[in-house]
């Protein structure tokens, strides 16, 4: 297998560290994020990075136990780029000075102007005299380390861009990875070019290497995979099937909470088109029976999660002799499981997943997507020949329509919701808007309203249309449909879906709202 050059991102706790990795992956550079406390001298030796980036972070170098890189990182002889706190830590370690941010803190947009000296990492910068950047710092560098020079300044950051070209050490006080630094991607491109990366980490290469890894890990053993029809599990299943053929059996659990025609689409796609061994477990009666009378969203999620594990175990036992469980774990999941702080966080919503399955079933994990971000999974799906209708699908929650039907769930409500959702998505596709939107769906509200249809009075449900734009689902804005589109959609839903007589549009952003209603 090809051994790719690797870039190490040492994470000091920034909220946007994953964006650094995304920018580098877009340049076909393989990189990994590791929290500073895990990066020991032994780790550095084993990882053998071709370049290193220090992320930003919320700490102060003056704080007791402040995050620090291992001293040996500066002796590797590879280029290093420090960002924000990463700049401060670099100066602190190499003999410069950092001061507390009394009156010199900068948060938000700023403009950096160049000095007379130019730096190769800044090729393409300052063509119009100054560059917009995004600052977010309290402390600041007051004296640069020996060997460093200043290459860019801002009103509150006289050392906004510094570098020691002889050692290929560079440090900036702003965040090049965020969209608010328009030429940030160019800075990363220059950095990896100076470090000698070939840009050879492509999805074609990843596919070949992943297949070889799966074959080496699994041998002649059997694998089971929980298939939901979503992008992650679909790509994982097709990749594993390409590697080991019918040693893989997929289990598709239909909990009765899927969209219109969804179960049939998944079965047709994987059993008929890909000829995969597939167990279609129609357990809708079990799930809907257990959810009868349940209105609390957390209880809904936990009931569905518990039953899913029970049902999956039951049907997986039918496979017989399976040693491995395949999961569509992605790189953000891996990063979060070895998080910078390891501290507790508030549970906003329980996540429906199969996290408890491997231990319960005594199975080993196959996770062929664990090095990839979501956009890379989609690219791999295209490489594998999955149809765009699957690859480009909007995210769909594990608990399905249960959390788009606030209050108690009934079969009647689910049928109304399915049909309204199908009309809405059809409208979005007809107007060519589907790919502009991160996620769109209908929520059926636990509210009945009076209406007039023909000469008669109606007393039916209200529904809410939801459509958001987002990059990663962490934050989201509502999609600005035209009034004509909304009016046309409302008319179609009311005319075509029996049981709804009022349509609203949800214009809440995230935060303060969440994307889903429950």
From Swiss-Prot:
Enzyme class: ligase
Known pathway: Purine metabolism; GMP biosynthesis; GMP from XMP (L-Gln route): step 1/1
Pfam families found in the cross-reference section: GATase, GMP_synt_C, NAD_synthase
Span of domain GMPS ATP-PPase: 201-393
Annotated keywords: ATP-binding, Glutamine amidotransferase, GMP biosynthesis, Ligase, Nucleotide-binding, Purine biosynthesis
Domain Glutamine amidotransferase type-1: 6-200
EC numbers for this chain: 6.3.5.2
Leader sequence residues: none
Assembly description: Homodimer.
Active site: 84, 175, 177
The keyword GTP-binding belongs to this UniProt entry's keyword annotation: no
Protein name: GMP synthase [glutamine-hydrolyzing]
GO cellular component labels: cytosol
Catalysis performed (reactions): XMP + L-glutamine + ATP + H2O = GMP + L-glutamate + AMP + diphosphate + 2 H(+)
Cited NCBIfam families: guaA_Cterm, guaA_Nterm, PRK00074.1
Residues the record lists as binding ATP: 228-234
InterPro entries: Class_I_gatase-like, GATASE, GMP_synth_C, GMP_synth_GATase, GMP_synthase, GMPS_ATP_PPase_dom, NAD/GMP_synthase, Rossmann-like_a/b/a_fold
Role: Catalyzes the synthesis of GMP from XMP.
Gene: guaA
Entry annotated with the keyword ATP-binding: yes
An MF annotation (GO) of this entry: ATP binding
């Amino acid at each position: 297998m090809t051994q790719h050059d690797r870039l190490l991102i040492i994470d000091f706790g920034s909220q946007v560290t994953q964006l650094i990795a995304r920018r580098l992956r877009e340049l076909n550079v393989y990189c990994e994020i590791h929290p500073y406390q895990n990066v020991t001298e032994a780790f550095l030796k084993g990882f053998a990075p071709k370049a290193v980036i220090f992320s930003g972070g919320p700490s102060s170098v003056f704080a007791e136990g402040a995050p620090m890189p291992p001293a040996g990182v500066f002796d590797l002889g590879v280029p290093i780029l420090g960002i924000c706190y990463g700049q401060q830590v670099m100066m602190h370690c190499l003999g410069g000075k950092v001061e507390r941010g009394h009156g010199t803190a900068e948060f938000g947009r700023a403009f950096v102007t160049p000095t007379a000296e130019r730096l190769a990492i800044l090729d393409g910068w300052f063509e119009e005299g100054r560059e917009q950047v995004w600052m977010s710092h309290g402390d600041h560098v007051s004296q640069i380390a020996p060997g460093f020079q200043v290459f860019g300044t801002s009103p509150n950051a006289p050392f906004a861009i510094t570098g020691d070209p002889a050692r290929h050490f560079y440090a900036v006080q702003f965040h090049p990875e965020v969209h608010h630094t328009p030429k940030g991607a160019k800075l990363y491109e220059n950095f990896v070019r100076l470090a000698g990366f070939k840009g050879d980490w492509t999805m074609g290469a990843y596919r070949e290497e992943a297949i070889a890894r799966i074959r080496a890990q699994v041998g002649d053993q059997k694998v089971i995979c929980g298939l939901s029809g979503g992008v992650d599990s679909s790509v994982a299943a097709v990749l594993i099937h390409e590697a080991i053929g019918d040693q893989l059996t997929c289990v598709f659990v239909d909990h009765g909470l899927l969209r219109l025609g969804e179960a049939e689409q998944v079965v047709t796609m994987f059993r008929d088109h890909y000829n995969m061994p597939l167990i279609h477990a129609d357990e809708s009666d079990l799930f809907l029976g257990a959810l009868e009378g349940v209105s609390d969203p957390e209880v809904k999620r936990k009931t569905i999660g518990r039953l899913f594990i029970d049902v999956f175990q039951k049907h997986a036992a039918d496979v017989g002799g399976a040693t491995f469980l395949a999961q569509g774990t992605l790189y953000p999941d891996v990063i979060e499981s070895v998080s910078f702080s390891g501290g507790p966080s508030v549970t906003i919503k329980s996540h429906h997943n199969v996290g408890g399955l491997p231990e319960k079933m005594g199975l080993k994990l196959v996770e062929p997507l664990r090095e990839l971000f979501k956009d890379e999974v989609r690219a791999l799906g295209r490489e594998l020949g999955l149809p765009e209708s699957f690859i480009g699908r909007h995210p769909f929650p594990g608990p399905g329509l249960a959390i788009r039907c606030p209050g108690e769930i009934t079969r009647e409500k689910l049928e109304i919701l399915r049909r309204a959702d199908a009309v809405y998505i059809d409208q979005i596709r007809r107007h060519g808007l589907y790919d502009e939107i991160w996620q769109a769906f209908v929520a059926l509200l636990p509210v009945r309203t009076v209406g007039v249809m023909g000469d008669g009075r109606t007393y039916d449900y209200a529904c809410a249309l939801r459509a958001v734009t987002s990059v990663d689902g962490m934050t989201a804005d509502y999609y600005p449909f035209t009034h004509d589109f909304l009016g046309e959609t409302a008319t179609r839903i009311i005319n075509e879906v029996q049981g709804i007589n009022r349509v609203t549009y949800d214009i809440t952003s995230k935060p303060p709202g969440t994307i889903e209603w429950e």
